[in-house]
Amino acid sequence: MATAAGEIYFIGEKDLRTKEFTQYFKVGIVRENENNADRDSTQRLLEHQTGNPRELYIESVVKTELVELVETLLQKKFAPLGVRGEWMLLDSDELAKVKSEAEILAAEASEIISDI
């Protein structure tokens, strides 16, 4: 597993007809490296918006030193909430739990990197 820093993003959806927010969230990553220095969660949002009939928005972003590890741990821990790929169906309490766990794992990743 690579040790790249980056961002864990939480992208949500809003129905354009009803104006209601859905409970679907994409939990994905953007790696920081010199090959895609201009790529961040906002850029990923635009990429995902193409072809999606609902309005996407960034619910939250967590920066971490070990982005792939943090994402893998989140996806494994919350697998029962997964719908398809990186998409999860989360009520507000579940979303808060996943975001909190992402923050905790990101802090632990910083400690690991600082010890190296």
Segments and roles (model prediction):
Residues 1-116:
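Non-catalytic accessory segments flanking enzymatic or RNA/DNA-binding domains
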